[in-house]
Amino acid sequence: MDFLNYPEPLADLITGLSRLPGIGPKTAGRLAFYLLQQPQVAENLAEAMIRAQREIRQCSLCCNYTDHDPCPICTGEKRERTLLCIVEQPRDVVSLEKTREFKGLYHVLHGVISPLEGVGPEQLTISKLLGRLEGVQEVVMAMNPTVEGEATALYLSRLLKPLGIKVTRIAHGLPVGGDLEYADEITIARALEGRRQI
């Protein structure tokens, strides 16, 4: 998008906003003009971003984002310490916690193995994971069902199984409200594999 007709600070704001995931130049322009018309919203947003950058860090145990180290999940007295769920990103922890079903601990990899993008095991938090397995009896792989997610889960399972740790994978299949007609073959196959008695 051509920002030549905009004052430089506005053009910089639009450019900065358009670098955010899912925000194209037109949406960035709309957001920029909104922020200019709502100075208090803009100030609050700027302060929140600066505060998050200053105060949020990775938990030294699970690598999730937190403002306390170790994080409240890792220090939670009611958490099942023999059960560890491995996820790709911090937002995955939030998704799992919303279900109120998982009572164990987490480990955030901050990505997946992706040779095409130059991401190998050493770029992930795998070494920290291997250092915190004492007492863990089961590891639940909760990676996304992508080629990279599957490769990462397979890599980790090969590391963990020789340690005598049970390695499981979350079930994949049709979403609630999904329609078989529109599902791809892999999704249907996974749904069949993950079937259970009712």
Curated annotation (Swiss-Prot):
Coiled coil: none annotated. PROSITE patterns: TOPRIM (PS50880). Residues 82-175 form the Toprim domain. InterPro entries: DNA_Rcmb_RecR, Rcmb_RecR, Rcmb_RecR_Znf, TOPRIM_dom, TOPRIM_RecR. GO terms for molecular function: DNA binding; zinc ion binding. It comes from the Bacteria. SUPFAM superfamilies: Recombination protein RecR. A zinc finger (C4-type) spans 59-74. May play a role in DNA repair. It seems to be involved in an RecBC-independent recombinational process of DNA repair. It may act with RecF and RecO. This is Recombination protein RecR.
